[in-house]
Amino acid sequence: MPQNEYIERWQKQHGKRFDHDERKRKRIAREGHDGSKKAQNYRGLRAKLYAEKRRKEKIQMKKTIRAHEERNVKTSEPAEPSTEALPQYLLDRSNEKNAKALSSAIKQKRNEKAARFSVPLPKVKGISEEEMFSVVKTGKKTAKKSWKRMITKPTFVGPGFTRRPVKYERFIRPMGLRYKKANVTHPELSVTVQLPIISVKKNPQNPLYTQLGVLTKGTIIEVNVSELGLVTAGGKVVWGRYAQITNNPENDGCLNAVLLV
């Protein structure tokens, strides 16, 4: 048995207290009071974080309650035209239908819409700042300062990029780690083409890395797909499309990406 499961081990050997279930029920029932007390007494950043956590819990709870209510709601739909003549007092009546089918159809449509924007790698491993940046010391020998950082991962900078003066440049992007092209695979056509990168749309690690144009696994980039000859329904040539990086460029020395279609 794993070392951290000593409570379960003890319970298997000796059993539980006779009032274990009752105590557990009461503890769960008291959680609301404890949460309220914390919300009233926390201050500063701790209070903000706790309030945000409580807000998300309440949203989830409301969704669950609404889902339970939806199951038994009945809605009326117009009856099919009858062949027999109905009396006046029966004309406003119609067949009742359970709303669950309608609700599930709406949810299905929402899921389909969300699937259009799904990516090949929904989750990626986090990268620490120590791994991303190396400290560069600067200044006189007697009073060196460590405010500069060198990016150790591949980056993309636009064609019109110019460095800031050395004295004011906080983040250094080495020339050897700058990429301009990516090997993009089209999932439906099953072809791989080397396409120029237009921009970095989103780095999942940190908004700062997006701003700096850092290229890590899972990053969404915009590539120029005019060479593929893709056209819209209206007949216009598609210029830029998003793609997601699927490899670790710092290890492989190249950028591999999958086009989001």
From Swiss-Prot:
The lineage of its organism: Eukaryota, Fungi, Dikarya, Ascomycota, Pezizomycotina. This is Ribosome biogenesis protein NSA2. Keywords: Nucleus, Ribonucleoprotein, Ribosome biogenesis, rRNA processing. One of its GO terms (cellular component) is nucleolus. Its main location: nucleus. It comes from the Eukaryota. Residues 1-84 are annotated as: Disordered. Belongs to the eukaryotic ribosomal protein eS8 family. Ribosome biogenesis protein NSA2 subfamily. CDD domains: NSA2. It comes from Phaeosphaeria nodorum (strain SN15 / ATCC MYA-4574 / FGSC 10173) (Glume blotch fungus). Residues 1-22, 49-74 have a biased composition (Basic and acidic residues). Component of the pre-66S ribosomal particle. Interacts with NOP7 and RRP1. Interacts with RSA4 (via WD repeats). The gene is NSA2. A motif (Nuclear localization signal) lies at residues 15-22. Gene3D superfamilies: 2.40.10.310. It is found in: Nucleus, Nucleolus. Involved in the biogenesis of the 60S ribosomal subunit. May play a part in the quality control of pre-60S particles. GO terms for biological process: maturation of 5.8S rRNA; maturation of 5.8S rRNA from tricistronic rRNA transcript (SSU-rRNA, 5.8S rRNA, LSU-rRNA); maturation of LSU-rRNA; maturation of LSU-rRNA from tricistronic rRNA transcript (SSU-rRNA, 5.8S rRNA, LSU-rRNA).
